[in-house]
Design a protein with these regions (language model features):
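Short alpha-helical elements
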Residues: 1-194
Length: 194
């Protein structure tokens, strides 16, 4: 990842590359390529989580042509951030990605993540306590899967139905974030494109 102006001249004019990328992004072409690549996923177990990404000063200060939500950059305790919400298969391969402002709660995006993935083959959906919600559990169970999400400490329900072995395998989603953040453009946001 680098600023658009720093692309090698052999690629062509940076404005043309930027316009092509932006056009493909708006038309959903990049998303469709991702969907085709993830078609043969092992969906027996799914894991989901969210991770913050710092927004570089160049992305946070660029002129806005549309609403703030279009750029998924929010202000939180760590400054300007974005958040990647990710659901991965049993092998740790990403199935669905949603990018929001950094101050968006995980559980508020989870229904959209679940709706974007076909749970017909899925036995268990695993997530951390940040996804503790009766509404989310009901959505997962309506799809025919089991929600393996621990209750928060302040809830009366106990975690007697938890499969702690599968919960430990949830590290696959953390590993996916680690792999993604090896790429400079993902570890730090450099532009306002969503």
């Amino acid at each position: 990842g680098c600023p658009w102006r720093d692309l090698p001249a052999s690629f062509g004019k940076f404005q043309a590359i930027y316009n092509c990328f932006n056009r493909w992004s708006k038309k959903g072409i990049i998303h469709n390529i991702f969907k085709i690549l993830s078609a043969d996923a092992d969906k027996e177990w799914l894991m989901m989580d969210g991770s913050h990404i710092r927004a570089h000063q160049h992305s946070a200060g660029a002129a806005a042509h549309s609403g703030e939500d279009d750029h998924a950059i929010g202000i939180s305790r760590g400054g300007a951030t974005s958040k990647i919400h990710l659901i991965v298969d049993a092998c740790g391969n990403p199935l669905e990605v949603i990018i929001t402002a950094g101050n968006v709660n995980d559980v508020s995006i989870a229904p959209e993540l679940i709706a974007a993935v076909d749970l017909a083959e899925t036995e268990v959906v695993s997530a951390d306590k940040g996804y503790d919600s009766d509404k989310l559990r009901a959505q997962i169970e309506e799809e025919g899967s089991k929600a393996n999400i621990p209750y928060k400490r302040d809830r009366e329900e106990k975690n007697k139905d938890m499969d702690w072995y599968l919960y430990k395998i949830r590290h696959l989603v953390e590993n996916a974030f680690a792999r993604l953040k090896h790429y400079r453009a993902i570890a730090t946001r450099y532009d306002k494109l969503k």
